[in-house]
Swiss-Prot record:
Record protein name field: Inactive casein kinase II subunit alpha-2
Taxonomic path: Eukaryota, Viridiplantae, Streptophyta, Embryophyta, Tracheophyta
Keywords: ATP-binding, Nucleotide-binding
GO BP annotation list: inflorescence development; photoperiodism
Keyword Membrane tagged: no
Species of the source: Oryza sativa subsp. japonica
Length: 90
């Protein structure tokens, strides 16, 4: 197995919970609480929409995941959890 030249040890100082997406337990919310307004982008594993929470009229971003392996979805969710609150993250 080859070793990455860049950021090979990036997770060494992080706790296992930060990078272990296979152990992630996903808590799915209620889909009926949200309404899609318009499409804002797409990626390899999902399409991204501007949305609204119908319970409180708050704007939100809705990421609709494409049908891919559960492992890839868990990895995507873990990355988004780690990015939450960062710069330019909605």
């Amino acid at each position: 197995m080859s070793k990455a030249r860049v950021y090979a040890d990036v997770n060494v100082l992080r706790p296992k919970e930060y990078w272990d997406y296979e152990a992630l337990t996903v808590q799915w919310g209620e889909q009926d609480d949200y309404e899609v307004v318009r499409k804002v982008g797409r990626g390899k594993y999902s399409e991204v929409f501007e949305g609204i929470n119908v319970n409180n009229n708050e704007k939100c971003i809705i990421k609709i995941l494409k049908p891919v392996k559960k492992k890839k979805i868990k990895r995507e969710i873990k990355i988004l959890q780690n990015l939450c609150g960062g710069p330019n993250i909605v």
